[in-house]
C-alpha cells in the first residue's frame, strides 16, 4: 500500500479491524483492488475492498448491510473525502469462479 495517502491507509486499516470484530474468524481475506491497488487513483476514486468469508449466501445477505454501515461511518468520519466500496463474497465461490469471471480475475490480479 505504498504511495497511498495516510488518511486512506488509516481508513482501510480501521475498516479491516471493524470487519474482523464483526465477522471474526469467518473473514478469510480482505483485498484492496481497483485504482488504489494499481496506484492510478485520483480524487474521485472510491476505495474498492473485497471481503472473502466462509459465510453462506444467506449469512452474507445478513451482514452486507452491517458492512455497508461500517463503511458509511468511516466515510462520514472523513467528511466523505474518501468512499469505501466493500464487496463481500464467499471464498469457495470466489475460487470456483476465479478463472471464469473477469471481475474476479481482476481482483486477483490487482489485489493487495
PLM segments and residue spans:
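Catalytic core of pol beta-like nucleotidyltransferases
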Residues: 1-29, 38-43, 54-112
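Short beta-strand->loop micro-motif that forms the acidic, two-metal-ion catalytic signature
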Residues: 48-52
Amino acid at each position: 500500500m505504498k504511495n497511498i495517502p495516510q488518511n486512506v491507509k488509516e481508513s482501510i486499516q480501521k475498516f479491516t479491524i471493524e470487519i474482523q470484530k464483526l465477522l471474526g474468524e469467518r473473514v478469510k481475506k480482505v483485498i484492496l483492488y481497483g485504482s488504489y491497488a494499481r496506484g492510478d487513483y485520483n480524487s474521485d476514486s472510491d476505495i474498492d475492498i473485497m471481503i472473502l468469508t466462509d459465510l453462506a449466501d444467506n449469512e452474507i445477505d445478513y451482514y452486507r448491510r452491517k458492512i455497508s454501515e461500517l463503511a458509511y461511518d468511516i466515510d462520514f468520519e472523513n467528511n466523505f473525502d474518501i468512499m469505501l466500496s466493500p464487496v463481500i463474497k464467499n471464498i469457495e465461490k470466489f475460487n470456483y469462479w476465479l478463472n471464469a469471471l473477469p471481475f474476479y480475475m481482476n481482483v486477483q490480479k490487482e489485489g493487495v
